């Protein structure tokens, strides 16, 4: 059996995705040109230059998600099923010696996020309890398990972060887009909370841990009341006040 060639595999997959998008772009440009010849105009004057940008990017062998798009361009492109416009995470599995920097550098040209791991180490790690895991990672000079890094990479690629709700018998994380305001975070929990949003009681994760509980956070006056324009921070502890 031939030795694995991860760069060739990445190139092959990337090429297939780019060719699929290239066909969509070329077909769309042809239709826009036909509309211009028949009607003397196109429905959206911003579309032809965007498609030309996409064409140049794909012909250069680069995925569309590497382009910086403004809000209007993002909305316009969402009407098409472009594969390379979607965020991509490449996971590189290696032995304990690690992955070469050249391979990581190349993978970064095709992906939003790159995670390198050793599956054998992760398998051994999964058989240990929490305390043993920490000792095992420390011995290997690894700061955190690959599973944690993969979750963080997925959140990063999708533009998400988390806030928490804390109750007497449950603590739960909720994912929202970065830049989300408090009512949107309320809607992630339940649509009624967003519809009847009044205020968000919030504190930081660090304050909660250092204080030891929400009651202690309130005693230390570190619980804040935030309104509709509050931008949710990663790790916020939030309790929604609402009325419907």
Identify the function of each model-found stretch.
Residues 1-18:
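Conserved P-loop NTPase nucleotide-binding/switch module
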Residues 15-18, 22, 48, 144:
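Amphipathic, non-membrane alpha-helical segments in soluble helical-bundle scaffolds
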Residues 22-30:
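Conserved phosphoryl-transfer catalytic core
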Residues 31-233, 238, 243-244:
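C-terminal-of-GTPase-core extension/linker across diverse P-loop GTPases
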